[in-house]
A protein has these predicted regions:
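Short, well-ordered, mixed-charge alpha-helical segments that flank or form enzyme active sites
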Residues: 56-57, 79-84, 90-95, 121-122, ...
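A generic structural signal for well-ordered coil/turn residues at beta-strand boundaries
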Residues: 33, 44, 66-69, 115, ...
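Conserved metal-binding segment of the jelly-roll/cupin
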Residues: 48-51, 112-131, 140
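Transition-metal
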Residues: 1-90, 150-193
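Short edge beta-strand segments in beta-sheet-rich domains
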Residues: 68, 130-133
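Fe(II)/2-oxoglutarate
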Residues: 105-112, 133-218
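Active-site glycine-rich loop that binds ribose-phosphate moieties when present
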Residues: 90-120, 142
Length: 218
């Protein structure tokens, strides 16, 4: 109903970005809706990749935004996991050697996951979803991906130079997010992460009973 009836978010934002996003975010995102939500169902290991921060993307990728992601694990086979972040003691030279010798997975943290887990993937953190994991991926609306390793599969381009440039080798934060639940009336909520660009809270909300509808009076 109303003037936006039947229109998608991309149409609404492109037609009136300043009204929907605010002036600052509309300018920074060039009129694009700032977030994407995808479902990734990994029947086999996905490529190992890394995304740039905004500053690098602005200089080297024609002004486009970088990308930070959050994965919510919707389902996972027993024993399945994700690769996310560098193992302790692994620096640039170790990653470079591993790339040359086609053994990059050895450099990364293998994190077992189960349904309901949340994984934070900021720009600069090397990562891959492994076989047997279904994630809901909430990410910045950017197409910039630097692929580093593809499990011996041929035919897709690698971007190892830029990937090494943007990798945060000082990053040792735990990608698996701890949840602090707050109880509400018939629901509970936990803030999974806070993204700074665009500025957004990413909550998880669990309904414990049906909520009474709010009826607006004419």
């Amino acid at each position: 109903d109303g003037p936006w009836a039947g229109r998608g978010l991309d149409e609404i934002v492109s037609g009136d970005a300043r009204r929907v996003l605010g002036s600052a975010l509309a300018a920074a995102r060039r009129g694009r809706f700032p977030l994407l939500v995808k479902a990734l169902d990994a029947s086999k290991n996905l490529s190992i990749q890394v995304h740039p921060p905004d500053g690098y993307a602005s200089v080297h990728e024609g002004g486009g935004p970088g990308k930070t992601e959050l994965w919510y694990v919707a389902d996972a086979d027993e024993g399945a996991g994700v690769l996310c972040g560098l193992r302790d003691g692994v620096g640039r030279e170790a990653v470079l050697r591993a790339l040359e010798e086609e053994r990059l997975p050895e450099c990364l943290r293998l994190i077992p996951v189960k349904k309901g887990d949340a994984i934070f993937v900021p720009a600069g953190r090397i990562h891959a979803v492994c076989a047997g994991v279904l994630v809901i991926e909430i990410e910045e609306n950017s197409d910039i991906t630097y692929r580093l390793y593809d499990w011996g599969r041929k035919g897709r381009p690698m971007h190892r130079g830029k990937g090494l440039d943007v990798t945060d080798f000082a990053d040792r934060s735990d990608p698996l997010l701890a949840k602090r639940w707050e109880e509400g009336d018939g629901f509970r909520t936990a803030r999974l992460a806070r993204m700074s660009s665009p500025e957004a809270d990413l909550p998880q909300i669990v309904l414990q009973r049906a909520l009474d509808p709010v009826v607006e009076q004419p």
